[in-house]
């Protein structure tokens, strides 16, 4: 006997209506490039009876429309990592999206309050909390502006600059902070807290590094696809148009967790010296003999020199070149035509082809060089990233290859490689502050680099840590001069330029919403309040007669 009486027919009809609504939703042009491995019925079964509309989905629609326009025009949305409400309100005047960096959050905003480098070892609600912080600020300043404008006449509004404070936010989901269920929960957090899009990378969660650190460990291709599917599943369950950005760190990766996915086989390094013990055994024996630190490193270096480490196709080419084979170049061409970075040939198939061409079982052991943590050695590169990006494309709105340098030729190689299979795929580019921009290119080239990338299809570009660096520079300059010349530093280097440039934060009480709150108080008290923050005696009256842009 059920606790609550329910009309089964009405329940079934409601379910079927919702399934039909989801199917209709998925027919929208926004989803024409998206692959789903489940049905609308599967999704509706996972929903509750109360459907909540999340404003972040409206922001996602706005973001998608914005990027569509950039794609048509061969332009780009370019932005940077925001730290706080000051950043987002100032960015909103000039930039059309906002980025939230896991790196910045790790160093400045962990929910544990413990600073850290970018290892994604902070509590997994850290970036969602920062997202909510900035999203609430956007909503507040939008309300404040709306209230101020509608205290004006239409003629006054026409003369008053308008700022769209609701710039879509794209946030850093790192590796998802765990398995599939963790990713689903993390995605829900981002949807609830204002994200229009999130990005997730193909590193292993326990060893995640900043994209510009060494020692990156990848997960197999299918494991990352599962993450992308998990994000879309969560977004579908919660009725969100959330954009998914798939990042690959394979360009500079050196390790892989597993050989299970044949699409990774081409890039796995093996030993070609059959007389050596596996490295892990050699290192264990050295430790048992009491060797430490430098001596252990020497043992590993000696083993590595003797191992003949290479990729399987390199071992095949070396065998053909060193052996007694007629038509060597023809043999190499036949092998490399069928086994190449984008062929997704399994090692078993590659071995069979090599034996057919050479008559030999070529020795190649990818187990022997495994590092002490158990990972396989891996040789990434641009074509490796292209191969992964092609696999991720059906499950992601945007693809991002993390790179070591701001190299246009490499960016073009990646874009061309992805678009050869997926011509309409949107791409993203990290204009990283880890690059030495003044060594990488001329000042003139710096000015046009974003536009050059946009023409290749990089529709969303961002400086991950510009919020951090601009804040550091401004505070360092002011603190140094303040120590030397006192209030002259503030008056001449901060306040005067604020007034001259029309930076509204110079009237910080008004910027923070004091007038808006006063008007709320008056609304509640019938129009009169003796405790108005901006009443007689407020010090911002000193700025009223200032001949400025404010």
Curated annotation (Swiss-Prot):
- Where is it located? Glyoxysome
**Cofactor(s) for this UniProt protein:** Mg(2+)
Show the active-site residues. 210
- GO cellular component term of the entry, any: glyoxysome
Pathway(s) this gene product operates in, as recorded in its UniProt entry? Carbohydrate metabolism; glyoxylate cycle; (S)-malate from isocitrate: step 1/2
Q: Which Gene3D superfamilies match?
A: 1.10.10.850, Phosphoenolpyruvate-binding domains
Give the Gene Ontology MF terms in alphabetical order. Answer: isocitrate lyase activity; metal ion binding; methylisocitrate lyase activity
Q: Which GO terms describe its biological process?
A: glyoxylate cycle; tricarboxylic acid cycle
InterPro entries, per database record: ICL/PEPM, Isocitrate_lyase, Isocitrate_lyase_ph_CS, Pyrv/PenolPyrv_kinase-like_dom, Pyrv_kinase-like_dom_sf
Q: Which cysteines are joined by disulfide bonds?
A: none
User: Keyword set for this entry?
Assistant: Glyoxylate bypass, Glyoxysome, Lyase, Magnesium, Metal-binding, Peroxisome, Tricarboxylic acid cycle
Q: Which PROSITE patterns match?
A: ISOCITRATE_LYASE
The entry marks the following residues as binding Mg(2+), namely 172
Tell me its EC number(s), please: 4.1.3.1, 4.1.3.30
Motif Microbody targeting signal, chain ranges: 548-550
Reaction(s) catalysed (UniProt annotation): D-threo-isocitrate = glyoxylate + succinate; (2S,3R)-3-hydroxybutane-1,2,3-tricarboxylate = pyruvate + succinate
Q: Where does substrate bind?
A: 101-103, 211-212, 247, 430-434, 464
**Principal localisation:** other
Its quaternary organisation is: Homotetramer.
- What family classification does the UniProt entry report for this protein? Belongs to the isocitrate lyase/PEP mutase superfamily. Isocitrate lyase family.
| Functional description taken from the UniProt entry | Catalyzes the formation of succinate and glyoxylate from isocitrate, a key step of the glyoxylate cycle, which operates as an anaplerotic route for replenishing the tricarboxylic acid cycle. Required for growth on ethanol or acetate, but dispensable when fermentable carbon sources are available. Also acts on 2-methylisocitrate.
What name does this protein carry? Answer: Isocitrate lyase
- What is the name of the gene encoding this protein? ICL1
